[in-house]
């Protein structure tokens, strides 16, 4: 038995003392989809302007050790995370996480800028939710977006 399995068995015993059958819970979780935010992998930096400042009320720092620096690194990190989370899930993909060599701004983004994400999601059998990005951008002023 490896460390993860030993730790699970200990947790299973503790939950059993309060009437929770963790095996049943894990079984039920197989049918519940969650949509993980893409920024879990890099603390909201994204790839549109990765050296830009986080503004607009964002409380993240964008500088944690091991943060994904490229879309490919983020996809690898997500694959690992999804392999550890029971069930099949979705990714909530923000606009600033586009994957393109083309220099574009928020008001110029097109579906083609996310083709690699779509290909990856199909291969991994993961759904995609799109989330527009309305912060940390010069066009976001006084609570208005793309003004």
List each language-model region with its residue ranges.
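Alpha/beta catalytic barrel-like cores
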Residues: 1-147
């Amino acid at each position: 038995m490896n460390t993860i399995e030993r730790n699970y068995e200990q947790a299973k015993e503790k939950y059993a003392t309060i009437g929770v059958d963790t095996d049943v819970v894990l079984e039920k979780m197989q049918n519940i989809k969650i949509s993980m935010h893409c920024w879990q992998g890099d603390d909201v930096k994204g790839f549109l302007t990765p050296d830009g400042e986080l503004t607009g009320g964002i409380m993240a720092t964008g500088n944690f050790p091991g943060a994904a620096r490229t879309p490919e690194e983020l996809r690898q990190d997500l694959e690992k995370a999804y392999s550890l989370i029971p069930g099949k899930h979705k990714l909530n993909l923000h606009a600033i996480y586009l994957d393109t060599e083309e220099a574009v701004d928020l008001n110029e983004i097109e579906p083609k800028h996310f083709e690699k994400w779509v290909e990856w999601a199909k291969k991994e059998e993961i759904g995609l939710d799109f989330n527009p990005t309305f912060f940390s951008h010069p066009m976001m002023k006084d609570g208005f977006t793309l003004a």
